[in-house]
């Protein structure tokens, strides 16, 4: 029996502008299963990131349906979606003065009170995510003081700290050397 966590039904992806609709891919049917590592591989510019933005609800589909836990992704409230899906995209972070620890701790935001106070359990989850990604030595550095490869690990730690049933990573090994690519893939397989 399949345990599908995310399903697409006849999904068409692309862009709508004032002048035209550009379809990148159409009639996509896929099933992502809980507990499985799934990779999407393809040439640059063919729509992988567009697909990921669409299946996570960031970008509207041109046609079709995306189901997360058998519920339309468009029907999720933002907080509920953040408790079921975490993602790491390729966009740059907005300017801020956050430390690495604080950036990873943002992954706990869907579970904190209205002022964002971390419980002892939240702090432990953040520390575990930092340990799993081997970035403890960076925790007190400002995120703008670290390399792109280190920042990629920090963003993955944030997704792990979010503790969701589904994690979507767009180009997760970008900026990582071979050793850290292997380490990350081993971590993701757990």
Locate the predicted segments by residue:
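Conserved structural motif at the start of ABC-family nucleotide-binding domains
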Residues: 6, 23-27
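The feature captures the beta-strand-to-loop junction immediately N-terminal to the Walker
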Residues: 41-43
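Helix-to-loop junction immediately C-terminal to a conserved catalytic motif
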Residues: 56
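Conserved ABC transporter NBD signature motif
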Residues: 64-72, 81, 141
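Conserved ABC ATPase "signature" region
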Residues: 105, 120-138
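Conserved ABC ATPase signature
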Residues: 116-118, 142-146, 150
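Catalytic Walker B motif of ABC-type/P-loop ATPase nucleotide-binding domains
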Residues: 167-171, 176
């Amino acid at each position: 029996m399949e345990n599908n966590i995310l399903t697409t039904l006849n999904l068409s992806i692309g862009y709508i502008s004032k002048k035209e609709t550009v379809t990148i891919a159409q009639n996509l049917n896929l099933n992502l299963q809980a507990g499985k590592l799934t990779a999407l591989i393809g040439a640059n510019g063919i729509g992988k990131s567009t697909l990921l933005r669409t299946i996570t609800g960031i970008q509207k589909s041109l046609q079709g349906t995306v189901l997360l836990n058998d519920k339309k992704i468009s029907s999720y409230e933002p907080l509920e979606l953040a408790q079921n899906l975490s993602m790491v995209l390729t966009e740059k972070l907005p300017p801020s003065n956050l430390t690495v620890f604080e950036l990873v701790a943002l992954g706990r935001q869907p579970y904190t009170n209205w002022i964002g106070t971390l419980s002892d359990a939240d702090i432990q989850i953040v520390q575990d995510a930092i340990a799993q990604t081997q970035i403890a030595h960076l925790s007190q550095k400002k995120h703008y003081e670290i390399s792109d490869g280190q920042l990629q690990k920090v963003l993955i730690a944030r997704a792990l700290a979010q503790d969701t049933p589904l994690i979507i990573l767009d180009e997760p090994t970008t900026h990582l050397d071979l050793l850290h690519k292997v380490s990350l893939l081993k971590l993701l397989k757990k």
